[in-house]
Amino acid sequence: MITPQQAIERLISNNELFYDEMTDLMRQMMSGKVPPEQIAAILTGLRIKVETVSEITAAAAVMCEFASKVPLEDADGLVDIVGTGGDGAKTFNISTTSMFVAAAAGAKVAKHGGRSVSSSSGAADVMEQMGANLNLTPEQIAQSIRQTGIGFMFAPNHHSAMRHVAPVRRSLGFRSIFNILGPLTNPAGAPNQLLGVFHTDLCGILSRVLQQLGSKHVLVVCGEGGLDEITLTGKTRVAELKDGKISEYDIRPEDFGIETRRNLDEIKVANTQESLLKMNEVLDGKEGAARDIVLLNTAAALYAGNIAASLSDGISAAREGIDSGRAKAKKEEFVGFTRQFA
């Protein structure tokens, strides 16, 4: 077993930790056995050295081990729609809006998220604003997925062991490995995923991590300028894991008959209230950039979740989900379901 001090010495010498060593180290941190000063040194050392696929995979596997899981007999059809955050773009809650549209098109969505770190509004913030109850038990979340097609897992409720590292993370003031672990540790075990990241380098890295963790169909995306969504302003880098193989390619809005925008100003918001207003406009069928970016991201989620055979088919299904009124009804159904447990 590696000690925290040995790990620190390895990292400051610019040497990577082997999978078993990272597993041991992570278990010690998640069990509260590593003092804050050493956690800070470990996170700093990993960041400076740059985390490897093996180190991230080991850390994610341990986080899953310690997580409070959602008990579902059949998780094979589940899809998660999630972003790392950290892009600083201040856009409205695109992935949360896409969740309702995807569910309206027949997807079973198990969304894992938290409060805002760098954005104007996190998934949990906007869900609370719309009246949803975030504090469901794992069993109630499983029931929500079965009944409404949507389950929201509020990250702090499922990763209580994070309390041992959270204060250090906050005090460091820079991105650490934990910024990318959240989207890799879905408590419902969703094997399919649309994952937005803040740097194109992470597309290849995290697709390989998810491959090793046993994911089935994943699209890891990074929009031009570091947006952790499929963007409207130009190309989006995609790393797709499917049938055990990874392929990387670029997509653009015009590939799907959607107008490329010069900037994202039309979809930026200042706070949670504005984000919910923008979401409601999309679900009400209002045309514009907000609708278009939701169509693109929902299409990718439907494709990742194997509901749509292609991104183009996904666009059609997403459009129909909104225009039929089913997406708006799905939001109301989900909120109503959660409130019965308030």
UniProtKB/Swiss-Prot annotation:
Catalytic activity from the UniProt record: N-(5-phospho-beta-D-ribosyl)anthranilate + diphosphate = 5-phospho-alpha-D-ribose 1-diphosphate + anthranilate
Matches recorded under InterPro entries: Anthranilate_Pribosyl_Tfrase, Glycosyl_Trfase_fam3, Glycosyl_Trfase_fam3_N_dom, Glycosyl_Trfase_fam3_N_dom_sf, Nuc_phospho_transferase
Keywords annotated in UniProt: Amino-acid biosynthesis, Aromatic amino acid biosynthesis, Glycosyltransferase, Magnesium, Metal-binding, Transferase, Tryptophan biosynthesis
Binding site for Mg(2+) 1: S95, E229
Superkingdom as given in the UniProt entry: Bacteria
Cofactor: Mg(2+)
Pathway entry: Amino-acid biosynthesis; L-tryptophan biosynthesis; L-tryptophan from chorismate: step 2/5
Positions with a binding annotation for anthranilate 2: R169
Signal peptide: none
Cofactor note: Binds 2 magnesium ions per monomer.
One Pfam match: Glycos_trans_3N
Amino-acid positions noted as binding Mg(2+) 2 in the UniProt annotation, renumbered to this chain: D228, E229
Enzyme class name: transferase
EC number: 2.4.2.18
Known partners and oligomeric status: Homodimer.
Function: Catalyzes the transfer of the phosphoribosyl group of 5-phosphorylribose-1-pyrophosphate (PRPP) to anthranilate to yield N-(5'-phosphoribosyl)-anthranilate (PRA).
Protein name (Swiss-Prot/TrEMBL): Anthranilate phosphoribosyltransferase
Species the sequence originates in: Neisseria gonorrhoeae (strain ATCC 700825 / FA 1090)
Lineage start: Bacteria, Pseudomonadati, Pseudomonadota, Betaproteobacteria, Neisseriales
Gene (name only): trpD
